[in-house]
């Protein structure tokens, strides 16, 4: 019986704390130690610094909060700008009425459209047909592109 009360393997120490609670405590204390090292340069707290530590941490929290708010505003503006750019790109690219393109599909389709236009220009240069880009020419290009796309060129590139 004496052996059971002095056993170092006991899950409860002399203060009545379980091993699980003891495992949690060093982690809790570890955080405090790391925080205190940041607040003092040499690791030893001084009475003057301890009194001032409360207000800078509150000010730091407010600063961090305002920085986070500003970052959120910037991110919202960036996202809005990106969405507007995609909307403009979707207006330029000829699409089918049933198309509801994601951003990646829009980019892939735009790249394919640019390639298509390049091929059209190359074939025009070979034929020495330098025509102006009128409304009718634009409509013909859109139609030709839609036909080209329906033939499977887009479906093959969408899988990549």
Curated annotation (Swiss-Prot):
Residues 27-37 have a biased composition (Basic residues). The keyword Repressor applies. Residues 1-63 are annotated as: Disordered. GO terms for biological process: cell population proliferation; cornea development in camera-type eye; embryonic cranial skeleton morphogenesis; face morphogenesis; keratinocyte proliferation; myeloid cell differentiation; negative regulation of cell population proliferation; negative regulation of DNA-templated transcription. One of its GO terms (molecular function) is RNA polymerase II transcription regulatory region sequence-specific DNA binding. Induction: By TNF-alpha. Expressed at low levels in sclerotome and dermatome of somites, and in limb buds at 10.5 dpc. Accumulates predominantly in dermatome, prevertebrae and derivatives of branchial arches by 13 dpc. Also expressed near surface of embryo and in chondrogenic cells. In adult, expressed at low levels in skin, bladder, uterus, aorta and heart. Residues 66-117 form the bHLH domain. GO terms for cellular component: cytoplasm; nucleoplasm; transcription regulator complex. It is found in: Nucleus; Cytoplasm. The keyword Lipid biosynthesis does not apply. It comes from the Eukaryota. It holds the Pfam family HLH. Keywords: Cytoplasm, Developmental protein, Differentiation, DNA-binding, Nucleus, Repressor, Transcription, Transcription regulation. Its main location: nucleus. PANTHER family: BASIC HELIX-LOOP-HELIX TRANSCRIPTION FACTOR, TWIST (PTHR23349), TWIST-RELATED PROTEIN 2 (PTHR23349:SF70). The C-terminal and HLH domains are essential for transcriptional repression. Efficient DNA binding requires dimerization with another bHLH protein. Forms a heterodimer with TCF3/E12. Also interacts with MEF2C. Binds to the E-box consensus sequence 5'-CANNTG-3' as a heterodimer and inhibits transcriptional activation by MYOD1, MYOG, MEF2A and MEF2C. Also represses expression of pro-inflammatory cytokines such as TNFA and IL1B. Involved in postnatal glycogen storage and energy metabolism. Inhibits the premature or ectopic differentiation of preosteoblast cells during osteogenesis, possibly by changing the internal signal transduction response of osteoblasts to external growth factors. This is Twist-related protein 2. It comes from Mus musculus (Mouse). The lineage of its organism: Eukaryota, Metazoa, Chordata, Craniata, Vertebrata.
